[in-house]
Amino acid sequence: METVPPSPITWPDGGALTNDWVHGLMSCFEWSSWNLPPSQLPSLLPVNVFDSLVLTAHKILHKERNCVHIDDLDSVSNVVVVGDIHGQLHDLLFLLKDTGFPCQNRCYVFNGDYVDRGAWGLETFLVLLSWKVLMPDRVYLLRGNHESKYCTSMYGFEKEVLTKYGDKGKHVYRKCLGCFEGLPLASIISGRVYTAHGGLFRSPVLPKRTTRGKKNRRVVLLEPEPSSMKLGTLDELMQARRSVLDPPWEGSNLIPGDVLWSDPSMTPGLSPNEQRGIGLLWGPDCTEDFLKKYELKLIIRSHEGPDAREKRTGLGGMDNGYTIDHNVESGKLITIFSAPDYPQFQATEERYKNKGAYIILQAPDFSDPQFHSFEAVKPRPKAHPYYDFENVIDSDDEMDKSAMDTNNEQPNS
């Protein structure tokens, strides 16, 4: 790594990013991770440049639908699907180099969880935003459960941003939260592959108005029994309100929480995800029903690393960065996890030493997954954790719901 410091990043005249600008940003972040204390990041990426990048990306993301249909693939030879990254910047940079950077014949779909746990969540997210701005129809960024106020306050991202940007940290953090709200929830690739961070979702409960007068009108939601829950539809997914800081676990807007937090199970049917306190568990029959109804071949989700899978019965481990969880008549359900040697700050003997992985879907039908596992980049720069990794809840279990912000108020700048 060069010891000569790079020049500070400036926003290009006219605001149009170039390939060289994005590569310069990546090089700048990699250099700073080795050579500067975190609090010096603004010397390379001034707040005004951060603001311009996030504002430009925010406008693009908020125009995308809840489920983006990626169909303009005539010139694309492959689509790369990436799982959780969790602030492991150097592994992301390796993955991009190993696979090939986004270009007109190579499309990327990132399945969420860009931040938290790892030490470079901000840099990771900004690298991905810069690629999105440069190539909006070749890079798709979906939301993960960690792109939320609750998770980022518990698993390190908020503290990371405040450490790096000091008295401007609250401003930077709020801008990131606003951008998180704009991230789409899911994608459908070439009409054959559905991707989302957590996975499937239930049909929402419709409110029942139970009063006579307008002044005293109340809305009552009757929560269904697990046996009466129905698998949701893509139309219902499109109509969900995604612009919330923390997806609700109750009420009529359950789809965002389901899509971000749910997990597969080997038990048939839908049931509450009691271990997480939000979202669903769905069985192989639900996978088959969803694939068959929409003539899909694959569901690709993320959300579970080696720590989560250690506790799951009947499902494969995450040693190689991926598992095939359901193999049904119409196709497959796959979990992909792209953060190797996870989690970063655990003592060596307590880390899982897992590989990360990504999936390549090749033309013409993009439905035959090729799995590519990779080792963590070593050595990593020295860094301090931004969360209490020894005592914090594992794998997002047993959530403190009182700490979640489930309204749809935009964060102030």
UniProtKB/Swiss-Prot annotation:
A single GO molecular-function term is: protein serine/threonine phosphatase activity
Reactions the enzyme catalyzes = O-phospho-L-seryl-[protein] + H2O = L-seryl-[protein] + phosphate; O-phospho-L-threonyl-[protein] + H2O = L-threonyl-[protein] + phosphate
Residues the record marks as active site = 146 (proton donor)
Induction conditions: By heat shock.
- Return the cofactor note field: Binds 2 manganese ions per subunit.
Q: Which SMART domains match?
A: PP2Ac
User: Binding residues for Mn(2+) 2, per the UniProt record?
Assistant: 113, 145, 197, 303
**Activity regulation statement:** Inhibited by NaF and orthovanadate, as well as by divalent cations such as Ni(2+) and Zn(2+). Inhibited by polylysine with myelin basic protein as substrate, but activated by polylysine with pNPP as substrate. Reversibly regulated by redox agents. Inhibited by submillimolar Pi concentrations. Slightly repressed by calmodulin (CaM).
Class of enzymatic activity (EC top level): hydrolase
Amino acid composition bias (Polar residues), ranges on this chain: 404-413
pH-activity relationship: Optimum pH is around 7.
Q: Its Enzyme Commission number?
A: 3.1.3.16
Source taxon at top rank? Eukaryota
Q: List the disulfide bonds.
A: 28-67
**Which residues are recorded as binding Mn(2+) 1?**
84, 86, 113
- List the subcellular locations: Nucleus, Nucleoplasm
Record bears the keyword Disulfide bond: yes
Region of interest (Disordered), ranges: 391-413
Q: What cofactor does its activity depend on? A: Mn(2+)
Q: Which tissues is this protein detected in according to the database?
A: Expressed in leaves, and, to a lower extent, in stems and flowers.
Query: What does UniProt give as GO cellular component?
Result: nucleoplasm; nucleus
PANTHER family the UniProt entry points to: SERINE/THREONINE-PROTEIN PHOSPHATASE 5-RELATED (PTHR45668), SERINE_THREONINE-PROTEIN PHOSPHATASE 7 (PTHR45668:SF9)
Oligomeric state and partners?
A: Monomer, homodimer, and heteromer. Interacts with calmodulin (CaM3 and CaM4) and HSFA1A/HSF1.
Q: What does this protein do?
A: Phosphatase active on para-nitrophenylphosphate (pNPP) and on various phosphoproteins such as myelin basic protein. Seems to act as a positive regulator of cryptochrome signaling involved in hypocotyl growth inhibition and cotyledon expansion under white and blue light conditions. Confers thermotolerance. Required for heat shock mediated-signaling pathway that leads to the expression of heat shock proteins (HSPs).
Q: What is this protein called?
A: Serine/threonine-protein phosphatase 7
What organism is recorded for this protein? Arabidopsis thaliana
